[in-house]
Amino acid sequence: MQRTSRLKRELSLLAAEPPPGITCWQDGDRMEDLRAQILGGANTPYEKGVFKLEVHIPERYPFEPPQIRFLTPIYHPNIDSAGRICLDVLKLPPKGAWRPSLNIATLLTSIQQLMAEPNPDDPLMADISSEFKYNKPVFFKNARQWTEKHARQKTDEEGMPGSLPEVGGSEGPSAAQKRKAGQLSSGGKRFCPDV
């Protein structure tokens, strides 16, 4: 019951006063299944990209964090090829920082901030993390190419936005990206736990 009343309030607030570059809405009839969209920030390799996310609200919300994953493929050290996100506020303590006082808007804003400022010391994608740390020009080039390929609004003949590719679709992650997801590098790097 608490989940339903809180979700209604949060969705109403998100509709009335959405954070800049973020939208969130109910997906179908089930209130616990939401969709969100984050616009890539200016001066980032994700600029002009439109990134769709899936948000599932657990039964014990707000005492458990929502489960959020990217549907749009993204080249990022903290987001894997399945769209899973390594971010402390998406996990319960002691390993995470979720608190019942946080809300969906806060989480989406935190994800938007992570897009702008990756954390290469807590990666899901070891190779991309190394690239970000030691060869930023290559990282930015690759991230821009992925954004162009997967997250740019396509228009039809009449100039109307078309649909965006989703993970697992015909334009999903490349075989190389899937391989990177399975590779762990040595050297004492810490990898995102419990994702």
From Swiss-Prot:
<feature type="compositionally biased region" description="Basic and acidic residues">
    <location>
        <begin position="146"/>
        <end position="157"/>
    </location>
</feature>
<feature type="cross-link" description="Glycyl lysine isopeptide (Lys-Gly) (interchain with G-Cter in SUMO2)">
    <location>
        <position position="189"/>
    </location>
</feature>
<dbReference type="InterPro" id="IPR023313">
    <property type="entry name" value="UBQ-conjugating_AS"/>
</dbReference>
<feature type="active site" description="Glycyl thioester intermediate">
    <location>
        <position position="86"/>
    </location>
</feature>
<comment type="subunit">
    <text>Interacts with FANCL and BRCA1.</text>
</comment>
<comment type="pathway">
    <text>Protein modification; protein ubiquitination.</text>
</comment>
<comment type="function">
    <text>Accepts ubiquitin from the E1 complex and catalyzes its covalent attachment to other proteins. Catalyzes monoubiquitination. Involved in mitomycin-C (MMC)-induced DNA repair: acts as a specific E2 ubiquitin-conjugating enzyme for the Fanconi anemia complex by associating with E3 ubiquitin-protein ligase FANCL and catalyzing monoubiquitination of FANCD2, a key step in the DNA damage pathway. Also mediates monoubiquitination of FANCL and FANCI. May contribute to ubiquitination and degradation of BRCA1.</text>
</comment>
<keyword id="KW-0832">Ubl conjugation</keyword>
<keyword id="KW-0234">DNA repair</keyword>
<dbReference type="GO" id="GO:0005524">
    <property type="term" value="F:ATP binding"/>
</dbReference>
<dbReference type="GO" id="GO:0070979">
    <property type="term" value="P:protein K11-linked ubiquitination"/>
</dbReference>
<keyword id="KW-1017">Isopeptide bond</keyword>
<dbReference type="GO" id="GO:0085020">
    <property type="term" value="P:protein K6-linked ubiquitination"/>
</dbReference>
<dbReference type="Pfam" id="PF00179">
    <property type="entry name" value="UQ_con"/>
</dbReference>
<keyword id="KW-0808">Transferase</keyword>
<dbReference type="GO" id="GO:0070936">
    <property type="term" value="P:protein K48-linked ubiquitination"/>
</dbReference>
<dbReference type="GO" id="GO:0070534">
    <property type="term" value="P:protein K63-linked ubiquitination"/>
</dbReference>
<keyword id="KW-0547">Nucleotide-binding</keyword>
<feature type="domain" description="UBC core">
    <location>
        <begin position="2"/>
        <end position="152"/>
    </location>
</feature>
<dbReference type="GO" id="GO:0006974">
    <property type="term" value="P:DNA damage response"/>
</dbReference>
<dbReference type="InterPro" id="IPR000608">
    <property type="entry name" value="UBQ-conjugat_E2_core"/>
</dbReference>
<keyword id="KW-0067">ATP-binding</keyword>
<dbReference type="GO" id="GO:0006513">
    <property type="term" value="P:protein monoubiquitination"/>
</dbReference>
<dbReference type="GO" id="GO:0061631">
    <property type="term" value="F:ubiquitin conjugating enzyme activity"/>
</dbReference>
<keyword id="KW-0539">Nucleus</keyword>
<dbReference type="InterPro" id="IPR016135">
    <property type="entry name" value="UBQ-conjugating_enzyme/RWD"/>
</dbReference>
<comment type="similarity">
    <text>Belongs to the ubiquitin-conjugating enzyme family.</text>
</comment>
<feature type="cross-link" description="Glycyl lysine isopeptide (Lys-Gly) (interchain with G-Cter in ubiquitin)">
    <location>
        <position position="180"/>
    </location>
</feature>
<feature type="region of interest" description="Disordered">
    <location>
        <begin position="146"/>
        <end position="195"/>
    </location>
</feature>
<dbReference type="GO" id="GO:0004842">
    <property type="term" value="F:ubiquitin-protein transferase activity"/>
</dbReference>
<dbReference type="GO" id="GO:0003682">
    <property type="term" value="F:chromatin binding"/>
</dbReference>
<keyword id="KW-0227">DNA damage</keyword>
<dbReference type="GO" id="GO:0035519">
    <property type="term" value="P:protein K29-linked ubiquitination"/>
</dbReference>
<dbReference type="GO" id="GO:0044314">
    <property type="term" value="P:protein K27-linked ubiquitination"/>
</dbReference>
<dbReference type="GO" id="GO:0006281">
    <property type="term" value="P:DNA repair"/>
</dbReference>
<dbReference type="GO" id="GO:0051865">
    <property type="term" value="P:protein autoubiquitination"/>
</dbReference>
<dbReference type="GO" id="GO:0000209">
    <property type="term" value="P:protein polyubiquitination"/>
</dbReference>
<protein>
    <recommendedName>
        <fullName>Ubiquitin-conjugating enzyme E2 T</fullName>
        <ecNumber>2.3.2.23</ecNumber>
    </recommendedName>
</protein>
<dbReference type="GO" id="GO:0005634">
    <property type="term" value="C:nucleus"/>
</dbReference>
<keyword id="KW-0833">Ubl conjugation pathway</keyword>
<feature type="cross-link" description="Glycyl lysine isopeptide (Lys-Gly) (interchain with G-Cter in ubiquitin)">
    <location>
        <position position="91"/>
    </location>
</feature>
